[in-house]
């Protein structure tokens, strides 16, 4: 009879590479050897071969994803507790996910898929209007949530500290920028947003008019808990004029930016050689005339993308103009590799693919216990209400 200890390490690694992300925790209890190998995977010592691990959104539900050059290998819906939650947005940082619920009040859930732990978080304010979120961490690896409110003339943001279970509020005085897209990416614990700068110019009547620049970058530094200065992109483009642009992280260490101009069928991708909250340098990664390999994509609408630096490939997710049908294109330099039909999906605010190259985390995020004094007070109130009825 063959024992688990008799299996070769290569075979065990192959088995572990096929284990759903959300089941890795159970694997560790199988035997000491498997426990050690799964720990290596957590610490990025042994990475899955030739595939990306991540999560994707299907009809407001979060599911795990494996993607390689042959396409999507499997779509496993996550734990029952998360499957019951309709999610509108998902953000990722260092093994944890932030899920924004689809309900009107937009509650927050922070989730560790590996440990199977979740924490529901009450938001601090009832401010209405456009807002966006991000999940990051400071230099001490403490996870934090950013909630940003922007309108034409002001910016207000709140920060939730996962470790202390507390919110803080901040104002940006007279911002000359605003964030009105959910286009952002996480690098080294900080979030980089696409934004626009406002500039005052004099017209022919010597009156001042406000104009906006094409897209630029701005970083939110989770250690300093503030926005940095403007960062340049390797090219100019303007989403308001029909250009398509997107951001993606590369193993949480580099930033990639994609461009497709409204009047061209060329996809251009650049990646950073250095990036910090106040400095960035770029190099070209990939430039493909998609008309020569796919034909004219008149209905191309960028949803999200990620890259494989070693193979010099990009996986670009697109939706049609109705945002109901999703397609993944695996493309390389001057050649088309594969097209994967993802089927019909409901329109989402969050990209269909949340991120790739997921790495499990051992960070504990169990629901914060309610202090006994507060719990007893709540019970007394509940009993009182019962008597009144």
UniProtKB/Swiss-Prot annotation:
This is F-box protein At3g19880. It comes from the Eukaryota. CDD domains: F-box_AtFBW1-like. Disulfide bonds: none annotated. SMART domains: FBOX. Residues 2-49 form the F-box domain. It comes from Arabidopsis thaliana. Pfam families: F-box, FBA_1. NCBIfam families: F_box_assoc_1.
